[in-house]
């Protein structure tokens, strides 16, 4: 009887350990939120942010967890200096007053143990709004050099920038919808 109880206790402990979440740190050298936005209804402008940080708590068994990504808005990059300077200024991001965009959410709706949605809130320009992203892919491997779990994901969604007080160009016919893509990699913390 004692052996049976010991075996059951070990089995329960093992299943609890395998279901535990792992803490990951966003790899800023491999994480670049990018976006597409309308230009006067005649073309699409694309850009990205070069500086992001954050953390993920991920339970690979359940396919659930939490995510927090902080993006430095001054790192916006359109590939055109004049547009970058304007976007950082008071007429758009106003990075001196609102230096960061922050997304906080939870990984949900797993299929075969992999989440398919990231449901949360985006705070930008002093405004917080709900935002749901589709998780297009998520894969974890053993990092060959660091010998730790390393995960990469691609998520996408869209939002109305006017909802965040970023309405520049609206009077000229610019559409307010922004398509967002986040390519992110994160390393398990020791």
PLM region spans:
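Positively charged n-region of N-terminal signal peptides that target proteins for export
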Residues: 1-5
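Hydrophobic helical h-region of N-terminal Sec-dependent signal peptides
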Residues: 6-12
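N-terminal signal peptide c-region/cleavage motif recognized by signal peptidases
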Residues: 13-18
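Low-complexity, acidic/polar, glycine-enriched regions of mature
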Residues: 19-190
């Amino acid at each position: 009887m004692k052996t049976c109880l010991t075996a059951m206790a070990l089995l329960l402990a093992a299943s609890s350990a395998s279901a535990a979440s792992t803490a990951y740190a966003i790899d800023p050298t491999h994480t670049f939120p990018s976006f597409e936005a309308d230009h006067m209804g005649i073309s699409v402008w694309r850009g990205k942010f070069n500086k992001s940080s954050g953390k993920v708590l991920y339970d690979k068994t359940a396919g659930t967890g939490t995510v927090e990504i902080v993006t430095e808005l001054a790192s916006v990059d359109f590939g055109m200096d004049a547009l970058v300077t304007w976007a950082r200024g008071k007429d758009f991001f106003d990075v001196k007053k609102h230096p960061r965009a922050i997304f906080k959410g939870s990984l949900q709706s797993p299929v075969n143990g992999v989440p398919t949605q990231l449901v949360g809130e985006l705070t930008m320009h002093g405004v917080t709004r709900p935002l749901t992203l589709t998780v297009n892919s998520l894969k974890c491997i053993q990092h060959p050099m660091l010998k730790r779990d390393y995960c990469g994901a691609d998520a996408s969604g869209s939002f109305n920038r006017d909802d965040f007080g970023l309405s520049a160009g609206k009077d000229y016919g610019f559409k307010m919808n922004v398509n967002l893509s986040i390519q992110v990699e994160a390393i398990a913390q020791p």
